[in-house]
Amino acid sequence: MEGALTARDKVGVQDFVLLDAYTSESAFVDNLRKRFSENLIYTYIGTLLVSVNPYQELGIYTVSQMELYQGVNFFELPPHVYAIADNAYRMMCAELNNHFILISGESGAGKTEASKKILEYFAVTCPMTQSLQIARDRLLFSNPVLEAFGNARTLRNDNSSRFGKYMDIQFDFQGIPVGGHIISYLIEKSRVVYQNEGERNFHIFYQLLAGGEEERLSYLGLERDPQLYKYLSQGHCAKESSISDKNDWKTVSNAFSVIDFTEADLENLFGIIASVLHLGNIGFEEDDQGCATIPDTHEIKWIAKLLGVHPSVLLEALTHRKIEAKTEEVICPLTLELSVYARDAMAKAVYGRTFTWLVNKINSSLVNKVGQRILDPLLLLTWKTVIGLLDIYGFEVFDKNGFEQFCINYCNEKLQQLLIERTLKAEQAEYEMEGIEWEPIKYFNNKIICDLVEERHKGIISILDEECIRPGPATDLSFLEKLEEKVGKHAHFETRKLAGPKGRKRIGWMEFRLLHYAGEVTYCTKGFLEKNNDLLYRHLKEVLCKSKNIILRECFLLAELENRRRPPTVGTQFKNSLSSLLETLISKEPSYIRCIKPNDRKEPSKFDDFLIRHQIKYLGLMEHLRVRRAGFAYRRKYEHFLQRYKSLCPDTWPHWHGPPAEGVERLIKYIGYKPEEYKLGKTKIFIRFPRTLFATEDAFEFSKHQLVARIQATYKRCLGRREYVKKRQAAIKLEAHWRGALARKAIQRRKWAVRIIRKFIKGFISRNKPLCPDNEEFIVFVRKNYILNLRYHLPKTVLDKSWLRPPGILENASDLLRKMCVRNLVQKYCRGITAERKAMMQQKVVTSEIFRGRKDGYTESLNQPFVNSRIDEGDINPKVLQLISHEKIQYGVPVIKYDRKGFKARQRQLILTQKAAYVVELAKIKQKIEYSALKGVSTSNLSDGILVIHVSPEDSKQKGDAVLQCGHVFEAVTKLVMLVKKENIVNVVQGSLQFFISPGKEGTIVFDTGLEEQVYKNKNGQLTVVSVRRKS
């Protein structure tokens, strides 16, 4: 327990309502400091979120954090901006009403970042469909574009919003984001042409120069150095280390592609941006008559090209003014000062209206284009709810405050008034009206300041408008004098003339001071009339209306030139816009985020007590805390409360027929509310603690599941019974029909079977008779059956002689089919033979013609395939190859040569070429026998391998016949015969053969059979060859 208390004391309390000294401002600040020092930047005041800008990344905005807060009761987890977003979303879905989240605070307090985090939370956690993915992405990516064109670096904030933005996120009845709409307020156009020291122009200018492609910049006539442009260099901080313009350009470029900007849109848009920079670089000189001239028209040409106007027309419009006098037009030259004013007015008008066009373009891409969803055949449910996000400029106090700060601070006064009306004042008034005991809490009501600014005919804006339109020379000084005359007695207004001796030293002669709810602000009236009028000379309007730039043509319509009525002033437009905004916000349920800036230097971990106390005071946080401590967190009319939670009590469910107040009393008694947790008013129930409401809501969620389960069970039982009865009746009827159909089908089948059997018997009896009606079907059946059976018994090879025996009537057809089948098998076999195999078979045919039935061993040789050669070319001596290189070797085989004298066996190679046969001994050719000199080839009828090549005895070149023994005698003889191309040269002898040894001398080879093969010289000097007898 002590450890828990120590931890709590270290990091403070996460809800200021739990502070013991809740009336002490010091305790309030001390709690903020403790949490800030531990990087706990969020703290609650009831359901209001206080956020302190950490000026650093804390890593608390991950997807896992979003999922952690999704669907969780508000106070179950530590304070977070995601909790505010989730609570607004769940309340919207549960009650089907509209909500808004008001984010307020000084400039630099983190309002824009809070707005982005809420938008990211909705994008990630809301249910999403593929078709609505585009709408979600466009909502997200609209932010970088608007920040680029509407935000700038100021002395207090590197990303200060210089316009007000209200975004409505539209959800359908399922809670899916389907679209959105953005309203912008009072873009600070004067920043386009002038920036204070240490400040920058709008981000887009620097991003374009830093990250734009070389081709784009060349087309726009721009250089990368921002110091070259007057409109970008006045604050002397064009390049800031804390801002990465190049990376931001990539983000903006990607966003443009997501939110449906075409290349033509971007070309026109950046043409306008570049033309503003070129405008700022136009230099004027004064001629002898005191009129303005432009000596260097280089920038004029670029502007004319980018805006699609004629250079001479633009030049004239910047140095002359067109004045209409009844039916005549007079063009008067401008002085140097007025030409500079015209140039700056044109730059501001072009940028301001382009920004408005940009917002409208984004809105057109955010329009909900999803079709209606049909939940019921008789109901089209198109209900849509919205959550609004208000990210508007914070209260600003600079060393020099002008018209823009006046409008911004007036806006903050109105928002403070809204908060007072919706919280402090309205809540206390409600307690009094409902008869709830209450101790009134004092607070400052800033309505008196709002009236000072906006009251009709009497307020500062009305006085400013009068001064702008009155005839005669109206000046900023005359406006200040008019203020002193009409509102000089107001307690919150002061000028140097009206102030006391001490106050005069701090107010200049052209200044006035307003005592705002946030403190005193001194405004310089210089430029008030000019900025309120926002005058653009008619001559310049005509030029812009005729521009070929599509965006400018939409921004400057020709109808403006025809309208002679004076347009409303900037102040009046802003006042009307604020009134419209407040009407929108009042119609929605609010959530509040109060942003606090911890220091003026944008330094992390630095906590400025004085600055924070000032913000706590003017944000009214102490008053809000006191109201929350003393008040009630939730109130609802009896009818609504009973209607929502009646299912929690058996007495009120499903219908309560008595007065709603009694029903609510019965309901809370059953639930178990303690007396200190609630009060019953005249028309409403008030619940003091959020935890009481959340417990009730949890019970309601559980009850809903039970009710749904019960309703589902009853409905399913009813549907099931109805379906069962329906199916049972259908099954009985189907069964009856099916049985009848089966019976009819069985009878028909039996009749059919009788007819078939009768025909079969008749056909069988008369099967041998000529074709007639009695046997026609039988014979067709027999034919068909035979053909069908035959296909499963066809021979697979040519050698397969089997054939299915046919019936007598099909013998002729069977013979024809058999011949066709054999022919088909032969063709199939022949098509499958390769060229190499075909050549081998041809050789086998020659072998058959020579040896079949004439020599033993022929039958065994049939299964031995012939080869191209039995000797590889590498086995032949290179010298031999060189000797016969002029001839191609066709065949080679190892042989044994027997000497003609003595019959000694010697290993040799027999090589056959195209022209001759060679008997080779290693590197020497022993005998060459040309085919032309070949007389014959002899071999025995036995299985020996003796081969005798006969030559002519008269041939002096030959030594005699060659007696060889070869292991592949069939192959060798066949190859030799095919090369000689004479089959009749082979002589298969029986018993013995004579061969030529030398001129006039012959030898004899005797062939015999025995138990084993042998070759030897017998006693008679003959060569005896013994073979084992085989079947031929």
Swiss-Prot record:
Residues 12-701 form the Myosin motor domain. The modification Phosphoserine is found at S365. It comes from the Eukaryota. Residues 855-1029 form the TH1 domain. The keyword Phosphoprotein applies. Residues 578-600 are annotated as: Actin-binding. GO terms for biological process: actin filament organization; actin filament-based movement; endocytosis. GO terms for molecular function: actin filament binding; ATP binding; microfilament motor activity. Residues 704-726, 727-756 form the IQ domain. Keywords: Actin-binding, ATP-binding, Motor protein, Myosin, Nucleotide-binding, Phosphoprotein, Repeat. It holds the Pfam family Myosin_head. InterPro entries: Kinesin_motor_dom_sf, Myosin_head_motor_dom-like, Myosin_TH1, MYSc_Myo1, P-loop_NTPase. ATP binds at G105, E106, S107, G108, A109, G110, K111, T112. GO terms for cellular component: actin cytoskeleton; cytoplasm; microvillus; myosin complex; plasma membrane. The keyword Transferase does not apply. Belongs to the TRAFAC class myosin-kinesin ATPase superfamily. Myosin family. Myosins are actin-based motor molecules with ATPase activity. Unconventional myosins serve in intracellular movements. Their highly divergent tails are presumed to bind to membranous compartments, which would be moved relative to actin filaments. It is linked to Central hypoventilation syndrome, congenital, 2, and autonomic dysfunction: An autosomal recessive form of congenital central hypoventilation syndrome, a rare disorder characterized by abnormal control of respiration in the absence of neuromuscular, lung or cardiac disease, or an identifiable brainstem lesion. CCHS2 is characterized by shallow breathing and apneic spells apparent in the neonatal period. Some patients have other features of autonomic dysfunction, including bladder dysfunction, sinus bradycardia, and temperature dysregulation. This is Unconventional myosin-Ih.
